Structures are given as structure tokens and as C-alpha cells.
């Protein structure tokens, strides 16, 4: 049943006029765990891995420029007609496998209520013919949207989060909300049972934004620094596991042949095992060129997100800094993250203080609680 909740991480408060949670200085950060070849035992029963198709090599054209979100070639004339999209995508059991994650340039994964995460998927340089299922906005959107001047596509939000959205004119005037009867969304109950049946696609959202006279292309998009050169002093790893919750974790496994990280999630059948996280359209395992783990303070708020009374969390990533783990090219790098202003991208540095650059391609960013009560980040070395 669709209705507004009064907002889950990834973020009905007593009064809709409440101000957003005040950012507080982060406490001293825990150190990044030391790599141990035996930190995580291999699953007792390995799940066969779906075939990973090699990604096509992009061929630059005279009109080609580098996508600011991925560092891959894209048409300059195409970028001139677009503004970044940030689509809220669910990640509970009935919502998997999702549509459209494989086409996102950049994905943020944030812990939500019920011990599960929610995705904030960024689209700019790739087209997605199906994106589902679209879900409600969270506090984290208010911190991420200003970085890219993005168009938020969502299905409502709690009263408190909607109030905060209305206070930000730039977000308010460009967002696309299914519950406001904005165009760009379709119900497809034959493909997914309600309330997980709200679909969209990138072209429909850009067309809907134009119909509402949303400025295109918007403010300049920050360029995320990428390089084909692998940084020095990385640690060769076979797998890295991120415990977002006691009942849900993500494991990135390195596929040397395809030169990508393959995404796996906790199994509902085998507590120690994992299953491939698949793309609904292709039935192939989701992959990434980069994964970034940002350790940040998570503060519980008084915003109620669901009928069970689950409370939203505020992830303190503005005016803050902390430890980070970077994954690329089959290696793990320890480093730091920093972000001073709401409209700024993160500054990433390696342990030696040198700037960290991502590998060209798609990226997943995990926000990991600094004071997690669950297992630490586990690493299996090669």
C-alpha cells in the first residue's frame, strides 16, 4: 500500500518543521582492519557464479569528452542536454533483483530501516531502459543531491524529510515524485507485486523534467578524478565483505579474467554463504570497477520511517572526515576521506597523503557506520 510515511538512512517526526539533524564533530575513528588471509573463511558451499560478460571498450569520437562521474568517453552534445538523475532504489528481498543498477554511473549504498540498505543511483552518461523499484527519499539524499545538482526521482518520503526537501528550493523545484503525480513513472504490477512495482527509465525522467521546465543541464557536475594507473602499495585481495547489518552484508569478489569486482550479498539460506547479486534485465551478476567504503558517524534521529517505528539515521558526511577503504584492480588501499561543504565531492587520499584516483568505470560507495555493532570489514587476501 502506497502512502507517505511520516524518513532511513541510506534516513513521522513530531513536527514537520523540525530542522535537519545538526552535524557534530566525528569522534576518533577506528583504524581500518588489518588484512589477514584467514579473516573470512570461504563459504562451505560455493554458489556457481553467473558468467561475467567483458565490458565493451568505449571508442572516443570527435564529440567525445570524459563523463564526470565515471571517466569514460561520452558525447559532449548528449551531456549538454542532461542533468544528473538520482533515483532511489529499494533493496529488500522482494525488490531483488533490481532493474537499472548495471547502467548507473555511480551508486551510493546506505543502511536503511529494518537492517537493509537503499540505493541512491546516479545516471548521467548511460541510458537505462528500466529502473525499479523506485522507493521513497531519505535524509542521505539531502546531503548528496547538492554535490551534483541532481534531479531526485522518488516515491514520496516521510513528512519530516518532505519538509526538509521543501526548504531546499533547488531540490524542491527539480524533483520528480510519483506521489505528486509527476510524469516519468509507470506501475507494472505484472512484473513486481505492489508496492514494489513503480518503474521508470532515464529518458522518461529527463523528458518529465523538461516538461516541468527544470533547467538543463544544470550547474556544472564535479569531475571525479580517475586514472588508468594503479596506485602503489595496494594489497592484493580476493574478497572484501562489508557488514551493513547482522543480517545483511555485501561481498565484493575480484574476477581477474573480467577485471571487475563482482557483487555478492548474504544468503537467506546459508548464514556463512553468499549469493550473486543479479541484474534483473540481464540475469548477470552486478559488477563494479571501483568500490569505496566510507566510515562515517551514523546518528539516530527522531524521524519515524515505517509503521514499525524504525527511526531514520543521519550519516554525517558534511563538514566531516574519516577513514576509507578503496577497491580497484583487484587491490585494496587504505586511506582517508574528507568533505567540507554540502555542494562538494569527497576528497580521497591514500595513506601516504597522495590523492586517490578511481579507475575509469562505475563505482559503488558504501557508507559504513563508524560505531557498527556488527562484524568489521573482512578481507581475504590473495
What are the roles of these predicted feature ranges?
Residues 16-67, 72:
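Ser/Thr-rich, Proline-interspersed low-complexity disordered segments
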Residues 8:
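Flanking scaffold residues of small Cys/His-coordinated metal-binding clusters
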Residues 1-4:
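Positively charged n-region of N-terminal signal peptides that target proteins for export
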Residues 11-14:
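Hydrophobic core
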Amino acid at each position: 500500500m502506497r502512502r507517505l510515511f511520516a524518513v532511513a538512512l541510506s534516513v513521522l517526526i513530531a513536527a514537520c518543521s523540525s530542522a535537519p539533524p545538526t552535524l557534530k564533530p566525528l569522534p576518533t575513528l577506528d583504524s581500518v582492519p588489518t588484512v589477514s588471509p584467514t579473516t573470512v573463511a570461504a563459504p562451505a558451499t560455493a554458489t556457481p557464479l553467473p558468467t561475467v560478460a567483458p565490458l565493451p571498450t568505449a571508442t572516443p569520437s570527435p564529440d567525445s569528452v570524459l563523463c564526470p562521474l565515471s571517466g569514460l568517453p561520452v558525447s559532449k552534445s548528449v551531456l549538454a542536454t542532461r542533468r544528473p538523475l538520482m533515483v532511489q532504489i529499494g533493496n529488500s528481498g522482494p525488490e531483488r533483483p533490481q532493474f537499472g543498477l548495471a547502467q548507473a554511473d555511480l551508486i551510493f549504498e546506505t543502511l536503511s530501516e529494518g537492517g537493509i540498505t537503499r540505493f541512491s543511483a546516479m545516471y548521467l552518461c548511460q541510458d537505462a531502459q528500466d529502473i525499479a523499484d523506485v522507493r521513497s527519499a531519505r535524509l542521505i539524499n539531502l546531503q548528496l543531491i547538492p554535490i551534483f545538482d541532481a534531479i531526485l526521482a522518488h516515491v514520496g518520503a516521510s513528512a519530516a524529510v518532505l519538509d526538509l526537501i521543501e526548504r531546499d528550493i533547488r531540490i524542491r523545484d527539480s524533483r520528480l515524485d510519483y506521489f505528486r503525480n509527476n510524469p516519468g513513472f509507470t506501475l507494472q504490477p505484472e512484473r513486481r507485486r505492489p508496492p514494489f512495482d513503480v518503474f521508470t527509465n532515464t529518458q522518461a525522467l529527463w523528458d518529465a523534467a523538461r516538461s516541468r521546465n527544470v533547467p538543463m543541464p544544470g550547474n556544472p557536475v564535479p569531475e571525479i578524478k580517475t586514472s588508468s594507473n594503479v596506485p602503489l602499495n595496494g594489497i592484493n585481495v580476493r574478497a572484501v565483505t562489508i557488514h551493513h547489518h547482522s543480517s545483511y552484508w555485501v561481498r565484493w569478489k575480484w574476477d581477474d579474467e573480467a577485471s571487475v569486482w563482482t557483487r555478492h550479498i548474504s544468503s537467506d539460506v546459508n548464514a556463512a554463504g553468499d549469493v550473486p547479486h543479479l541484474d534483473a534485465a540481464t540475469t548477470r551478476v552486478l559488477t563494479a570497477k571501483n568500490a569505496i567504503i566510507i566510515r562515517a558517524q551514523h546518528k539516530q534521529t527522531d524521524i519515524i520511517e515505517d509503521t514499525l517505528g524504525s527511526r531514520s539515521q543521519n550519516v554525517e558526511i558534511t563538514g566531516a572526515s574519516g577513514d576509507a577503504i578503496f577497491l580497484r584492480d583487484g587491490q585494496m588501499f587504505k586511506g582517508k576521506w574528507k568533505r567540507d561543504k554540502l555542494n562538494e565531492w569527497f576528497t580521497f587520499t591514500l595513506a601516504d597523503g597522495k590523492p586517490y584516483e578511481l579507475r575509469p568505470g562505475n563505482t559503488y560507495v558504501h557508507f559504513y557506520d563508524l560505531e557498527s555493532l556488527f562484524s568489521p570489514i573482512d578481507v581475504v587476501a590473495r
